[in-house]
A protein has these predicted regions:
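Thiamine diphosphate
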Residues: 1-159, 162-166, ...
Length: 273
């Protein structure tokens, strides 16, 4: 975000508690308020409808907002704006008013968040046409995806699992990576393999493909330790657009597949996939 704000004066960052020195309750944007000032990094009222809805007006006058919904659980008051205005503006205006924005959403269960700070919302979001949804599993991917989202003309929602901030949880150490260069951009809609099964196990019919994303990548890696060379792990990185071709190739290769998600199974994105 710092690099984007340095390169683009039209880039703004706002949301609840992101201003001044704090940079969000998870400190992921700490000091940016001090660096760029209150006109470009600022706090908003506790009103998600305003945070999301304001991106329409900001975009219309040539600004490029990066906004934060403090927790995925709080996105519900903003869904009306996301569904009726942000996602449809391009279509309803015949291309005259695209809403180009990045909406960051810390998500997932972490620590003692309880019922109001632990939700996953990807199944709701993937049913909204007109937005793109990404869900990185490590710091390097997040940087590349953030750059791609910023330069994309469409509204992009970035889901960031709270348990992956700082790589503090046991088994998630690989979320901490060497920072890529400033021009590092990852195209949206491209999955990647993070673990490969051996050719021998595949030929024996003893291999399995796990399709997952976000925190699920690390749960899958832990489970794979019990099945030597038998597991292929596919990190989606992008939920929409979805890398259907690569998913199909992997599942066809193994003839066995598990879709791993944190959400309840019934009527979910994972079940649909």
């Amino acid at each position: 975000i710092k690099e984007l704000m340095q390169d683009h004066l039209e880039c703004l960052l706002y949301g609840q508690d992101v201003g001044k020195r704090l940079g969000g309750v998870f400190r992921e944007a700490a000091t940016l308020g001090e660096t760029f000032g209150d006109e470009r990094v600022f706090n908003t009222p506790i009103q998600e409808a305003f945070i999301i809805g304001s991106t329409v007006g900001m975009s219309a006058v040539g600004l490029k907002p990066i906004v934060e919904i403090q927790f995925a659980d709080y996105i519900w008051p903003g869904l009306n704006q996301l569904f009726t205005e942000v996602s449809r503006s391009y279509y309803l205006s015949n291309g005259k008013w695209p809403v180009s924005c990045v909406i960051r959403v810390p998500t997932g269960a972490y620590g003692s968040g309880g019922p109001y700070h632990s939700s996953s919302v990807e199944s709701i979001l993937t049913n909204i046409h007109g937005i793109k949804i990404v869900y990185p599993s490590n710091a390097a991917d997040l940087k590349g995806i953030m750059k791609a989202a910023f330069y994309d003309p469409n509204p992009v929602v970035i889901l960031e699992h709270k348990g992956l901030y700082w790589g503090k949880l046991k088994g998630t150490e690989e979320t901490k990576t060497i920072e890529p260069s400033q021009d590092y951009v990852l195209p949206l809609g491209k999955a990647k393999s993070v673990l490969l099964a051996s050719k021998e196990k595949i030929e024996q019919g003893k291999s399995l493909c796990i399709v997952t994303y976000g925190m699920g990548v690390y749960w899958a890696k832990q489970a794979a330790k019990k099945f030597n060379n038998q597991i292929d792990i596919l990190d989606l990185r992008s939920l929409y657009p979805l890398d259907e071709k690569y998913i199909y190739e992997k599942v066809k290769l193994h003839s066995n597949c598990i879709v791993l998600s944190e959400e309840p199974k019934q009527n979910s994105f994972a079940q649909s996939l």
